[in-house]
């Protein structure tokens, strides 16, 4: 069982464990713990070879591959092929310099091990790496002089080679030398392949084979990975009681743990993972994280990006579990055991996507250009990719946004959207004036001076002010000289007249269920920015919640 955070035995205790127990400990260990256990273990090389290639790769990336040659020179050929698969491609192009970096580390091993590992790498991948760096000028059959032929057979397998540059000559000359000394027939076979292959077709073939190997690790093509974001209706989601089918290598391989350790779960998910998960669930979670990384086209070696996507994936899983099981960790664990992790991820994502769709509909409506500050922050956060929680909902003094941490935040956001949609209906269906576009307001000589500076609260309060001044309910600018008259009608002891507040809220509630919340929001603004200002100190340039025509423009 994988637990978070890991509790590991001392090295002596680790050596006394049987093989499955040792592998389970390694699965739970962080990078430095894993390195220490593997290096000190008597069967470290055997244990390392059993670990999933991605776990070994992430360990190397976290600690620095050039810092742990003693470990990487124990890695299996399958793991080495994975290092090149994970770290040496830019789209469908093999990166020459990144391949050099890994080959340089490989060549630090003992020569017999290097030769054996090179022979067991994916052959076409090895040919492509050499082809990028080495030109075979001629082979043994082209040498007429027997003395020259004999000399060349003693070095570089009898071939005349040109290298891309001096550094490449040192690296690939060393590679060919090792192969010639310990596997001469393979060396000749490799150079003949380099001599005969076309680079473009070979690279395409290697790229396709790489895709198959990545898929075995739960890493699909980026286009196919987009299905991880497919909509799943929360209202109709049901956890199936049927047995789950093992994913990818989970049926035969050692379960991974490195990717799961990079991020920290929260909420009920943290309780579930803290109690431990079995190998099948560890595979599912890793495959899910991998699919999200591929969908986002994240470099698998960019640990900060991987960690960020891990936090995001855990956050959405937590939303799904809270939606299905509340805070009951036992029920949540049952959901994780009976529903695929990807289904739960899609459920959590859909809970936030549903909020985003509502926010987008409001922003595309006529009111969208005039949202007041908190509501604009709300919709701005929801329109991010992925949808995010606006902190102004819980801390009015803050304006940040972050991932949704709990279902409570989803529910709070829904409540704010309910209020925002009520505002939309008030303006679109009930108020007796249309909302023009921001460029169609005639505000020359007014404060605010342009439609883009207006908010729904200012538009409503200006219309209400006109009504109190016995004019039609419409957002026509007030004359600066009318502010003192309005102040006397609205203010009582620095607060909004309680009778006016009650009447206004009752009227809005009669027009639209939930409309009174908008009225309360607007009157609170009036109370702070208008009522608390003494009449003698009213300055039309600084009065909030009203459209005022300045005296100088009259």
Regions found by a protein language model. Name each.
Residues 1-74, 78-554:
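General marker for long, soluble alpha-helical cores
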């Amino acid at each position: 069982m994988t637990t978070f955070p890991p509790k590991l035995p001392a090295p002596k205790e680790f050596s006394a464990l049987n093989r499955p127990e040792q592998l389970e400990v390694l699965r739970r260990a962080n990078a430095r713990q894993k390195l220490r256990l593997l290096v000190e273990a008597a069967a470290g090389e055997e244990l390392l070879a059993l670990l999933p290639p991605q776990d070994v790769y992430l360990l190397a990336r976290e600690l620095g591959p050039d810092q742990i040659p003693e470990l990487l020179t124990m890695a299996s050929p399958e793991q080495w092929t994975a290092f090149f698969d994970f770290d040496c491609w830019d789209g469908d192009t093999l990166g020459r310099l990144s391949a050099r970096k890994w080959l340089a580390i490989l060549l630090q091993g003992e020569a017999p091990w290097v030769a054996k590992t090179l022979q067991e790498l994916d052959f076409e991948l090895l040919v492509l790496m050499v082809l990028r760096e080495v030109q075979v000028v001629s082979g043994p059959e082209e040498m007429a002089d027997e003395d020259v032929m004999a000399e060349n057979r003693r070095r570089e397998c009898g071939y005349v080679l040109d290298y891309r540059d001096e550094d490449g000559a040192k690296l690939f000359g060393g590679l060919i030398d090792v192969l010639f000394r310990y596997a001469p027939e393979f060396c000749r076979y490799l150079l003949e392949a380099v001599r005969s292959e076309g680079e473009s077709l070979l690279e395409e073939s290697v790229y396709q084979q790489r895709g198959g190997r990545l898929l075995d690790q739960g890493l699909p093509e980026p286009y196919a990975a987009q299905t991880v974001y497919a909509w799943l209706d929360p209202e109709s989601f049901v956890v199936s009681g049927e047995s789950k089918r093992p994913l990818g290598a989970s049926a035969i391989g050692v379960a991974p743990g490195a990717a799961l350790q990079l991020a920290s779960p929260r909420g009920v998910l943290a309780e579930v993972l803290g109690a431990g998960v079995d190998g099948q669930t560890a595979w599912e979670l890793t495959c899910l994280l991998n699919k999200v990384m591929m969908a986002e086209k994240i470099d698998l070696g960019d640990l900060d990006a991987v960690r960020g996507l891990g936090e995001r994936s855990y956050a959405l899983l937590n939303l799904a579990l809270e939606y299905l099981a509340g805070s009951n960790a036992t029920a949540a664990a049952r959901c994780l055991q009976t529903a695929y992790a990807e289904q739960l991820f899609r459920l959590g994502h859909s809970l936030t996507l549903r909020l985003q769709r509502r926010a987008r509909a409001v922003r595309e409506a006529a009111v969208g250009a005039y949202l007041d500050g908190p509501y604009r922050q709300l919709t701005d956060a929801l329109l991010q990719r992925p949808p995010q929680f606006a902190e102004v909902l819980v801390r009015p003094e803050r304006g940040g946004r972050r991932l949704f941490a709990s279902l409570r935040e989803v529910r709070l956001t829904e409540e704010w959207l309910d209020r925002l949609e009520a505002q939309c209906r008030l303006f679109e269906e009930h108020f007796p004036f249309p909302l023009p576009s921001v460029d169609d307001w005639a505000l020359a000589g007014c404060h605010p001076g342009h439609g883009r500076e207006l908010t729904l609260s200012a538009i409503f309060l200006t219309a209400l002010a006109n009504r109190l001044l016995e004019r039609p309910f419409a957002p026509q600018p007030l004359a600066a000289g009318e502010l003192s008259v309005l102040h006397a009608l609205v203010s009582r002891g620095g607060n909004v007249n309680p009778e006016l507040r009650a009447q206004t809220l009752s009227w809005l509630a009669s027009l639209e269920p939930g409309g009174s919340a908008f009225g309360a929001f607007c009157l609170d603004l009036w109370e702070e920015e208008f009522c608390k200002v003494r009449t003698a100190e009213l300055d039309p340039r600084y009065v909030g919640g009203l459209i005022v025509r300045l005296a100088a423009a009259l």
